[in-house]
Regions:
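Glycine-rich, mobile lid/loop segments that gate access to catalytic sites or pores
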Residues: 98-194
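Glycine-rich phosphate/pyrophosphate-binding loop regions near the starts of catalytic domains
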Residues: 41-97, 107, 187-194
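N-terminal hydrophobic or amphipathic segments with adjacent small-residue motifs
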Residues: 14, 18, 77, 82-84, ...
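N-terminal amphipathic/basic leader segments beginning at the initiator methionine
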Residues: 2-54, 58
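Generic structural "secondary-structure junction" signal
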Residues: 23-25, 32, 54-55, 65-67, ...
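A generic structural signal for short, solvent-exposed coil/turn residues
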Residues: 15, 30-32, 55-57, 72, ...
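A broad, low-specificity signal marking well-ordered, structured residues that form hydrophobic/aromatic
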Residues: 21, 38, 61, 78, ...
């Protein structure tokens, strides 16, 4: 039996709220019953976004939809599920990604293109779309500007611990807050090609 563990990694630091960003997580039972597996990050109107995606031509449905949506609209929400990557799922996977965006958009009162989907987990299996959609009210009910640590837990799959960083800096008399959360990075090699 192999035992994997994080070595010499610090615990999750305090993650400062970012004005205009609210986060909510829930246990939607997408793959496992006892873990946070659905995250919604709501962005205030006018939020600017940038993204880096895989260079691989064969990419998951959420990557295709996210690229498309970021090219069409300013994001109002990021929708992140763990458990199933919605990769290698063909047109059904595309439909699932689009339907999940439409479901959240209907609740938020925005265009479906303003919702950017992200999925991580097992490849080759479809999302349990009804469980994902049923979990959306739980995420929205848990929304807060301080939900960063919970969101860091909510995006984990095989990660051994949540990862995030936060800094406040003063620039020309204004305090700027930069906060981010991340997953493990092993799957991005070589050169963003997975």
């Amino acid at each position: 039996t192999l035992l994997y563990m994080a070595v010499n990694l610090p615990p999750l630091p305090e993650l400062y709220p970012v004005p205009g960003i609210r986060l909510g997580t829930t246990r939607a039972q997408i793959r496992k019953k006892d873990r946070r597996d659905l995250v919604v990050i709501e962005c205030a109107p006018g939020t600017q976004a940038a993204a880096v995606f895989t260079q691989n031509r064969f990419c998951a449905a959420p990557v295709t939809v996210a690229r498309d949506h970021l090219g069409q609209a300013t994001p109002r929400a990021l929708l992140i599920n763990t458990g199933f990557a919605n990769a290698g799922t063909g047109q059904e996977g595309m439909d699932d990604a689009l339907q999940s965006c439409a479901a959240l958009a209907a609740i938020l009162g925005c265009a479906p293109q303003a919702v950017v989907p992200f999925s991580t987990g097992v490849i080759g299996e479809r999302l349990p779309l009804q469980r994902l959609i049923a979990g959306l009210p739980g995420c929205l009910g848990a929304m807060s500007d301080g939900g960063w640590a919970e969101a860091a837990h909510g995006i984990m799959t095989t990660d051994t611990l949540p990862k995030g960083s936060s800094r406040r800096v003063d620039i020309e008399g204004k305090t700027i807050t930069v906060t981010g959360i991340a997953k493990g990075s092993g799957m991005i090699c070589p050169n963003m090609a997975t």
